[in-house]
């Protein structure tokens, strides 16, 4: 698959342990926290283990200015004090999206990212207990996760 159009042309699987397309870009941190608190028990109940999302890399253009022979992948993997040097990747890492799956040229129009994007993967906390969550009603999963949501 090469385009978003290609992706929507294939049939969706009946069940999947993965979900794509949650956005945490917001001006309100409280809004992001509310989305995660609401979504988490639903993800556990549905058996989702991983969440994938796409992100721009807004520091890329400035970083490449002084490094004519550098590769985009080098920027995406670059760390300072163990954290990604790109501010967006650093933010997503703090929210649990620690795996960089792919670097995608022409991902979407974003000037500071030179239209590059990265595909990131995060693991749904406590998803290894999938058989337990599947056996419980959603209300019980919500009751269990509510006091733990501050850890997200």
Predicted segment positions?
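Conserved acyl-donor/pantetheine-binding loop and adjacent beta-alpha core of acyl/acetyltransferases
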Residues: 1-26, 31, 42, 57-85, ...
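Short acidic/polar active-site loop segments enriched in Thr and Asp
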Residues: 49, 98
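C-terminal "cap" of GNAT-fold acetyltransferases
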Residues: 83-90, 95, 106-142
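Activity-critical C-terminal alpha-helical subdomain
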Residues: 146-147, 151
């Amino acid at each position: 698959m090469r385009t978003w159009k290609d992706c929507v042309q294939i049939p969706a699987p009946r069940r999947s342990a993965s979900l794509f397309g949650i956005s945490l870009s917001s001006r309100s941190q409280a809004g992001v926290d509310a989305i995660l608190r609401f979504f988490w028990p639903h993800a556990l109940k549905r058996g989702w283990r991983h969440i994938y999302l796409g992100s721009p890399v807004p520091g890329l253009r400035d970083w490449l200015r002084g490094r004519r022979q550098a590769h985009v992948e080098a920027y995406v993997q670059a760390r300072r004090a163990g954290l990604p040097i790109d501010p967006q990747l650093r933010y997503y890492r703090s929210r649990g999206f620690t795996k960089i799956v792919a670097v995608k040229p022409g991902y979407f129009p974003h000037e500071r990212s030179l239209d590059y994007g990265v595909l990131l993967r995060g693991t749904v906390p406590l998803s290894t207990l999938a058989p337990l969550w599947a056996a419980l009603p959603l209300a019980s999963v919500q009751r269990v996760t509510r006091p733990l949501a501050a850890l997200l």
